[in-house]
Design a protein with these regions (language model features):
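Short, conserved beta-strand element in jelly-roll/cupin
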Residues: 42-45, 57-74, 112-115
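Hydrophobic/aromatic beta-strand elements that line small-molecule binding cavities or substrate pockets
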Residues: 42-44, 88, 98
Length: 137
């Protein structure tokens, strides 16, 4: 059974280890206390780095992101381009093909994924042209 856990900002540190080289990640300790069932981390833009815009998908059951500050522009297969701003949250269905197009220098977001260990695969969307879609807000 998971135990109670707290992670304070002042005690955490950002590391350049993670899925994307253009981000820094601060582990929130959730993977350890859930025995690998869930991972949660704060992600922020790495200074001087930009996204590659590569299409990919994640083999996971749940992926949820909440934008703390800044903005990020994604493109999803079958959905189109979606701009996320501070206060936006999104759930990505399992294996949805997507890519990040760009983000602000001050981007910071929380990501929660289950299971904690998941695979990411390069992908090409079946339909390259997706209708533009704007998120409210």
């Amino acid at each position: 059974m998971p135990r109670f856990h707290v992670s304070h900002r002042k005690d955490g540190k950002f590391e350049r280890r993670g899925l994307r080289s253009y981000f820094e990640y601060r582990d929130l300790g959730i993977k350890r206390v859930t025995g690998g069932k869930v991972v949660a981390h704060v992600i922020r833009a790495r200074p001087g780095s930009a996204p590659h815009g590569e299409w990919h998908y994640h083999d996971c059951a749940v992926q949820f992101v909440y934008v703390l500050r800044g903005w990020v522009l994604f493109e999803y297969e079958g959905v189109g381009r979606v701009m996320m701003k501070a206060g936006s949250c999104f759930y990505q269905p399992p294996r949805i093909r997507h890519r990040e197009l760009k983000h602000s220098k001050n981007l910071e977001m929380i990501e929660v994924v289950a299971p904690a260990s998941f695979k990411t695969f390069a992908a090409t969307p079946a339909a390259r042209k997706s209708p533009a879609r704007r998120s409210p807000g």
